[in-house]
């Protein structure tokens, strides 16, 4: 199966913004980051938002905020980047890997449903290569 990926869409405006950020001396937690956090919070109709350096950091923070840790299980797709499973290990929980459905890049939802136990505290679905999981099906199962 050939999965097409698109090249980055970076134009002159994005390049100028990067140059301006580099010239500002602030490339992480400076005023541009704080302004972005305010704008994204407003866009999401919430009081606060926080910028993180990666989806990996975001997933680990989310698991910690949910109180997930030793003794807990978190279900995720076996077909994913290692970070998805490693953040589960970082918080002390046990990853439960679900194979993809035959002919698909999505988790096998029947196997996912059968893997849920009293120790299951979360499911981390994986959208891959532009293919979005069937979240209605996942919500219907949980």
Model regions and ranges:
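Phosphate-binding glycine-rich loop
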Residues: 26-73, 87-91, 97-99
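Short alpha-helical
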Residues: 13, 35, 57, 82-83, ...
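PLP-dependent aminotransferase-like
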Residues: 64-141
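N-terminal "arm"/small-domain region of PLP-dependent enzymes with the aminotransferase-like
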Residues: 1-27, 31
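Generic hydrophobic secondary-structure packing signal
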Residues: 14-17, 45, 51-54, 58, ...
């Amino acid at each position: 199966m050939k999965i097409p990926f698109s090249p980055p869409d970076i134009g002159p405006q994005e390049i100028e913004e990067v140059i301006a950020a580099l010239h500002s001396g602030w490339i992480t937690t400076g005023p541009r980051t704080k302004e972005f956090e305010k704008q994204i919070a407003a866009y999401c109709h919430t009081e606060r938002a926080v910028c993180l350096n990666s989806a990996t950091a975001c997933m680990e923070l989310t698991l910690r905020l949910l109180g997930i840790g030793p003794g807990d299980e978190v279900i995720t797709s076996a077909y994913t980047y290692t970070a998805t499973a490693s953040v589960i290990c970082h918080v002390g929980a046990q990853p439960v890997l679900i194979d993809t459905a035959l002919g698909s890049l999505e988790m096998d939802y029947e196997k996912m449903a059968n893997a849920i136990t009293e120790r299951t505290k979360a499911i981390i679905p994986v959208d891959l290569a532009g293919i979005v999981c069937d979240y209605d099906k996942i919500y219907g199962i949980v």
